[in-house]
Curated annotation (Swiss-Prot):
This is GRB10-interacting GYF protein 1. Residues 148-179, 186-203, 239-267, 388-401, 696-722 have a biased composition (Basic and acidic residues). Interacts with GRB10. This transient binding is increased under IGF1 stimulation and leads to recruitment of GIGYF1/GRB10 complex to IGF1 receptor. Interacts with DDX6. Keywords: Phosphoprotein. Gene3D superfamilies: 3.30.1490.40. The GYF domain interacts with GRB10. Belongs to the GIGYF family. It comes from Homo sapiens. The gene is GIGYF1.
C-alpha cells in the first residue's frame, strides 16, 4: 500500500523528503471538480522548499506599502513553536467547544457537514491542531524533517490554514451542508478546497482503477456520501441515518457525526478534553481498514495529550484500557462544563447514545462545583437554535431540528437500552459520589435558563458590562485569549482544573460575569488573597474604580478567609452526611423527566437543611447575628435569589442542590450581613491607618530633604562668602600697593608753577574720557566674573588734585586706569636717553599736551593687546623698579582686560576641554602665557586637563599660536618704541622751542611728522592737541 503512495512527486523531490512523507496531506487545487495535478507534495516537501532568507522584493519597499509591510517574513506555522494557547488547545482545556463551533471555528463540531475525510474532529480551530487531543500518526515518526510532535501537530492542517484564513464564512456555511443531504454535496465541496476534498476524489479514482485499499474512505456523492458500505457490509460511517437506526433505536437528525462513538466514549470516561473523542463518520472502531493510513491510529502510536511540561501522554482507546476511575470523573466533569453547548450538541445525543440516562444539561453543568450557574443555560438546550441560527442562516431548519431534539435531551432522553446506558449510570453515580465533597453550588433557574437561551453572544455582553448578581453567569469566569477574543463563560471548577494544569499565566486577563473589567490573573490572586478558582468565599463584584476595589477586596478576603474556612469545613461534613439521599435524588432526576419531584422529598430535604442551618448557626461568632455567615456564603456561592425549589434539586449537584434550597428559603442573599459590614469597617480603619502612616512617612522624608537642602545652601553660601572675602582682600592689597606706588611717584618734587597743573590735569581729564570705552570693556569683563557692583565712572577723575582724583576712582577703574597709565611713570625716562630731570610732574604747560598725547598713544597702542603692554614695560626696564612695582604688575596681570584673539581662543579651548568645568580658565590662560618652556606648557596642560589626545593637541596649537603672537608683538613693540621715542623728542623740542632758531624749529616740525600713523593699524586715530594735528596736516 505504501509503495503506491510513494509515487506522488518526482524522484528528486521524494529523495529530498526521504520518501517518508506518505502520511502528509498534500495541498490541494482550489476546485475539486477539475482534474487534479499529477504531482502533489507533502507538507515536509513543501517545508523543504521554504527559504528563510528571502528578502523583501524591491518593488514592495515603496513608501505606500510601509504601513503594511513587515521586514521579517512570517515563518510557516509548522516551524514556529506552539504558543501557550495552542498547547492548551490540544487537551481541549481552553475553549468551550460550543463557543468555538458557534464562532465557526471547528473544534470537533458535531455537525455532519464538517467532517470530511479525516473524521469529525479533524477540523481544528484556526487550522492549528485538534482542539481536543493530539493525533499521533506515522507522519510523526518518519517525516522528512523529524519535526517534533508539537510542530507536526501545528501544521497538520497545512492547507486548511490558508483557506481558513480567507474563507471563514464559506467554511461556516459549508459546515452545515451535511444536513442537506444530496443537494449539499457541491456546495460542501466548493466551500472547502482542502486536503480532504482532493483526497476523497483521488481515492475514488484509485478505487475505480485499482480496487482501492482504502475502500470506502472517500465521501460518496450526494445522498450516499455518508452512507457508503464498509468492508464488513454494515454501515461504515456513523451516519445520521443508518447508525441512528442501528444503534440508537431512535433517530437523530442532528448528531450523525458523533453517533457511532457513544459506546467508546461511554466506556472511556466520556472526557472530550483528554480522552480520544470519536472520529465519525469514518467509524473508527468498525472501519479502521476502510480508511487511509494517514487518518488511522497506528497500533503503537496512540492518541494523547501534552501535560504542563510538554511531555506526550499516550491515552489508550477507551474500550481497550479504561482510564482509572478518578481520571474518568475529572474528565467527565470537565467535558460537561467546558463544552456547555455539548448539553445540546454533543452531550445531548451522546447522552442519548452513550449514557441513555444523562444528567440534563443543566445538571451536567452544575456537576462541577462552580459558582457559575449558567453554562447550561447559555449554550444548552436550544442554544443551538438561538446562537447558531443567527450565525449560519443557511442551516436554520437544521437548527430547529436541533432545538426539538435538545429539550428532548432534558425531558425525555429515551428508555435505557444499552450496555452504554448502564455504564452511563455508573459514571453518574461515581461522579455524584466524588462531587458530593465539593462545596460550591451551581444551581440553575428556569428564568435564567430561558433568558440565557435568548441572549445571543452572552460572552461579549458579559465581557463588556457587569452582569447583575441575579444573573446565571454572574459568577462564571471569562477570559481574553492571546488573540484578544473573549472566552467563556466557564465554571470555577473548570478554571481551577486548567489553572492547576498550568494553562493560565499570571498575565491572563480574567473576570467574572459580575465584574466590570478584565484584570490580570496575578492581580486577582493578590486581591482575593487566594487562587480565585479554589473553593472559598467570593468577593463582591468589582465595579467602578478597580484599583481601590482591588486593595479593598484583598484585605477583606484576607480577614474573612480564616473564619470562612471553618464554616466551609463544618458545612462539608454536614453535607457529606446527607450524601446518599441526595444521590438518589439526582439519579431520579436524571432518569425521569424534568418535572418537579413529588412534594415529600423537597419537604424532607427542606427540614433536613433547616436542621443544617441551625447547626451552622451554632458555629457563628456571636457578633454577627443570625445572618452573619449565610448572606456571605450565599453571595460567595453565587446562589440566585429566586427559583423554584425543585429546580435546585434537579439541576444542581447533589449537596449543592440542598444547600441552594437552604439558602434560598431562609435568607435573601441580596442583604449584606453584619460580617461584611464589620469587615468593611475594619478594612476602612486599616486603610485610614495606612494613609496616616504613609503621610507621616512622606512628611519625615520631606523634612529630611529640606534639612539636607538647607545644609547644602548654607555650605554654598559659606563657600561663596569665603571666595568673596578672598577677592576683597586681594583688591584691598592691590589698592594698597597702588597707593604706595603712587606715593613714591609723588615723592618727586613738583615745581609750583601756577599755570602748569591746570592744563596737565585738563589734558588728563580729557584723556580719561577718551579712554572710557576701553575701561568699560574691562569693567564689563570683571563684572561678569566677580559679580561686583558696577564701578563708578572714571570721568569722576576730574578733580583738580591728584589725591582726590585717585580717591574718586572706583576700585576696579583705579586699577585699570593706573595699569593703562603705567607707561606714564616710566615713559619719559624710557626714551629720554637717561635724562632724569624730565619727570611727569616737571613738565611745562606746553609739554603737557605732548605728554598727554604720548599717553594717548600708549593707551591706544596697548588696547589691541593690553597684556603685552605689561610684558613690554617689564621686559625692557630702563630705570630701576622697586619690588612693589613688580608685585603690582603681576597683580595687574590677573585683572581681566580686553582680550585679544589669542587669549579668547585659549579660554574657549580650555572651557571646551575642561570636563568638570571646575578649571579657573582665566588664571590658567595667564599662567600658560607666562610659562616659557614648551615642556612646562605641556606639563601644566596635562595637570589641568589630564593626559588626553585633546590636551596634547591643545598644547601643540597653543605653542604655535603663542610663537606667532610673540613675533607679531615684537614687531609692534619695535615700531612703538621708535614712535614713542620720536614723540618724546618732539615734546622735548616743543618744550624748548623758544630757545631754538627757526631752522631747528622746522627740523622739529619735520620730526613731528613721524607721529602720523595709519588709523587702520591701531584701530582708532590718535587724539593729540589741535595744534599737533594742524602741524601734521600742514605737511
Amino acid at each position: 500500500m505504501a509503495a503506491e503512495t510513494l509515487n506522488f512527486g518526482p524522484e528528486w523531490l521524494r529523495a529530498l523528503s526521504g520518501g517518508g512523507s506518505v502520511a502528509s496531506p498534500p495541498p490541494s487545487p482550489a476546485m475539486p471538480k477539475y482534474k487534479l495535478a499529477d504531482y502533489r507534495y507533502g507538507r515536509e516537501e513543501m517545508l523543504a522548499l521554504y527559504v528563510k532568507e528571502n528578502k523583501v522584493p524591491e518593488e514592495l519597499q515603496d513608501k505606500e506599502f510601509a504601513a503594511v509591510l513587515q521586514d521579517e517574513p512570517l515563518q510557516p506555522l509548522a516551524l514556529e513553536p506552539l504558543t501557550e494557547e495552542e498547547q492548551r488547545n490540544f487537551s481541549l482545556s481552553v475553549n468551550s467547544v460550543a463557543v468555538l463551533r458557534l464562532m465557526g471555528k471547528g473544534a470537533g463540531p458535531p455537525l455532519a457537514g464538517t467532517s470530511r475525510g479525516r473524521g469529525s474532529t479533524r477540523s481544528r480551530g484556526r487550522g492549528r491542531g485538534d482542539s481536543c487531543f493530539y493525533q499521533r500518526s506515522i507522519e510523526e515518526g518518519d517525516g522528512a524533517f523529524g519535526r517534533s510532535p508539537r510542530e507536526i501537530q501545528r501544521s497538520q492542517s497545512w492547507d486548511d490554514r490558508g483557506e481558513r484564513r480567507f474563507e471563514k464564512s464559506a467554511r461556516r456555511d459549508g459546515a452545515r451542508c451535511g444536513f442537506e443531504e444530496g443537494g449539499a454535496g457541491p456546495r460542501k465541496e466548493h466551500a472547502r478546497s482542502d486536503s480532504e476534498n482532493w483526497r476523497s476524489l483521488r481515492e475514488e479514482q484509485e478505487e475505480e482503477e485499482e480496487g482501492s485499499w482504502r475502500l470506502g474512505a472517500g465521501p460518496r456523492r450526494d445522498g450516499d456520501r455518508w452512507r457508503s458500505a464498509s468492508p464488513d457490509g454494515g454501515p461504515r460511517s456513523a451516519g445520521w441515518r443508518e447508525h441512528g437506526e442501528r444503534r440508537r433505536k431512535f433517530e437523530f437528525d442532528l448528531r450523525g457525526d458523533r453517533g457511532g462513538c457513544g459506546e467508546e466514549e461511554g466506556r472511556g470516561g466520556g472526557g472530550s478534553s483528554h480522552l480520544r473523542r470519536c472520529r465519525a463518520p469514518e467509524g473508527f472502531e468498525e472501519d479502521k481498514d476502510g480508511l487511509p493510513e494517514w487518518c488511522l491510529d497506528d497500533e503503537d502510536e496512540e492518541m494523547g495529550t501534552f501535560d504542563a511540561s510538554g511531555a506526550f501522554l499516550p491515552l489508550k482507546k477507551g474500550p481497550k484500557e479504561p482510564i482509572p476511575e478518578e481520571q474518568e470523573l475529572d474528565f467527565q466533569g470537565l467535558e460537561e462544563e467546558e463544552e456547555p453547548s455539548e448539553g445540546l450538541e454533543e452531550e445531548g445525543p451522546e447522552a442519548g447514545g452513550k449514557e441513555l440516562t444523562p444528567l440534563p444539561p443543566q445538571e451536567e453543568k452544575s456537576s462541577s462545583p462552580s459558582p457559575l450557574p449558567t453554562l447550561g443555560p447559555l449554550w444548552g438546550t436550544n442554544g443551538d437554535g438561538d446562537e447558531t441560527a443567527e450565525k449560519e442562516p443557511p442551516a436554520a431548519e437544521d437548527d430547529i431540528r436541533g432545538i426539538q431534539l435538545s429539550p428532548g435531551v432534558g425531558s425525555s432522553a429515551g428508555p435505557p437500552g444499552d450496555l452504554e446506558d448502564d455504564e452511563g449510570l455508573k459514571h453518574l453515580q461515581q461522579e455524584a459520589e466524588k462531587l458530593v465533597a465539593s462545596l460550591q453550588d451551581s444551581s440553575l433557574e428556569e428564568e435564567q435558563f430561558t433568558a440565557a437561551m435568548q441572549t445571543q453572544g452572552l460572552r461579549h455582553s458579559a465581557a463588556a458590562t457587569a452582569l447583575p448578581l441575579s444573573h446565571g453567569a454572574a459568577r462564571k469566569w471569562f477570559y481574553k485569549d492571546p488573540q484578544g477574543e473573549i472566552q467563556g463563560p466557564f465554571t470555577t471548577q473548570e478554571m481551577a482544573e486548567w489553572f492547576q494544569a498550568g494553562y493560565f499565566s499570571m498575565s491572563l486577563l480574567v473576570k467574572r460575569g459580575c465584574d466590570e473589567g478584565f484584570q490580570p490573573l496575578g492581580e486577582v490572586i493578590k486581591m482575593w488573597g487566594r487562587v480565585p478558582f479554589a473553593p472559598g468565599p467570593s468577593p463582591p463584584p468589582l465595579l467602578g474604580n478597580m484599583d481601590q476595589e482591588r486593595l479593598k477586596k484583598q484585605q477583606e478576603l484576607a480577614a474573612a478567609a480564616l473564619y470562612q474556612q471553618l464554616q466551609h469545613q463544618q458545612f462539608l461534613q454536614l453535607v457529606s452526611s446527607r450524601q446518599l439521599p441526595q444521590c438518589a435524588l439526582r439519579e431520579k432526576a436524571a432518569l425521569g423527566d424534568l418535572t418537579p419531584p413529588p412534594p415529600p422529598p423537597p419537604q424532607q430535604q427542606q427540614q433536613q437543611l433547616t436542621a443544617f442551618l441551625q447547626q451552622l448557626q451554632a458555629l457563628k461568632p456571636p457578633r454577627g447575628g443570625d445572618q452573619n455567615l449565610l448572606p456571605t456564603m450565599s453571595r460567595s456561592l453565587s446562589v440566585p435569589d429566586s427559583g423554584r425549589l425543585w429546580d435546585v434539586h434537579t439541576s444542581a449537584s447533589s449537596q449543592s442542590g440542598g444547600e441552594a434550597s437552604l439558602w434560598d428559603i431562609p435568607i435573601n442573599s441580596s442583604t449584606q450581613g453584619p460580617i461584611l459590614e464589620q469587615l468593611q469597617l475594619q478594612h476602612k480603619f486599616q486603610e485610614r491607618r495606612e494613609v496616616e502612616l504613609r503621610a507621616k512617612r512622606e512628611e519625615e522624608e520631606r523634612k529630611r530633604r529640606e534639612e539636607k537642602r538647607r545644609q547644602q545652601q548654607q555650605e554654598e553660601q559659606k563657600r561663596r562668602q569665603e571666595e568673596e572675602e578672598l577677592f576683597r582682600r586681594k583688591h584691598v592689597r592691590q589698592q594698597e600697593l597702588l597707593l604706595k606706588l603712587l606715593q613714591q611717584q609723588q615723592a618727586v618734587p613738583v615745581p609750583p608753577a601756577p599755570s602748569s597743573p591746570p592744563p596737565l590735569w585738563a589734558g588728563l581729564a580729557k584723556q580719561g574720557l577718551s579712554m572710557k570705552t576701553l575701561l568699560e570693556l574691562q569693567l564689563e569683563g570683571e563684572r561678569q566674573l566677580h559679580k561686583q557692583p558696577p564701578p563708578r565712572e572714571p570721568a569722576r577723575a576730574q578733580a583738580p588734585n591728584h589725591r582726590v582724583q585717585l580717591g574718586g576712582l572706583g576700585t576696579a577703574p583705579l586699577n585699570q586706569w593706573v595699569s593703562e597709565a603705567g607707561p606714564l611713570w616710566g615713559g619719559p625716562d624710557k626714551s629720554g636717553g637717561g635724562s632724569s630731570g624730565l619727570g611727569l610732574w616737571e613738565d611745562t604747560p606746553k609739554s603737557g599736551g605732548s605728554l598727554v598725547r604720548g599717553l594717548g598713544l600708549k593707551n591706544s597702542r596697548s588696547s589691541p593687546s593690553l597684556s603685552d603692554s605689561y610684558s613690554h614695560l617689564s621686559g625692557r626696564p630702563i630705570r630701576k623698579k622697586t619690588e612693589e612695582e613688580e608685585k603690582l604688575l603681576k597683580l595687574l596681570q590677573g585683572i581681566p582686560r580686553p582680550q585679544d584673539g589669542f587669549t579668547q581662543w585659549c579660554e574657549q579651548m580650555l572651557h571646551t576641554l575642561s570636563a568638570t568645568g571646575s578649571l579657573d580658565v582665566p588664571m590658567a590662560v595667564a599662567i600658560l602665557k607666562e610659562v616659557e618652556s614648551p615642556y612646562d606648557v605641556h606639563d601644566y596642560i596635562r595637570s589641568c586637563l589630564g593626559d588626553t589626545l585633546e590636551a596634547k593637541e591643545f598644547a601643540k596649537q597653543f605653542l604655535e599660536r603663542r610663537a606667532k603672537q610673540k613675533a607679531s608683538q615684537q614687531r609692534q613693540q619695535q615700531q612703538e618704541a621708535w614712535l614713542s621715542s620720536a614723540s618724546l623728542q618732539t615734546a622735548f623740542q616743543a618744550n624748548h622751542s623758544t630757545k631754538l632758531g627757526p631752522g631747528e624749529g622746522s627740523k622739529a616740525k619735520r620730526r613731528a611728522l613721524m607721529l602720523h600713523s595709519d588709523p587702520s593699524i591701531l584701530g582708532y586715530s590718535l587724539h593729540g592737541s589741535s595744534g599737533e594735528i594742524e602741524s601734521v596736516d600742514d605737511y
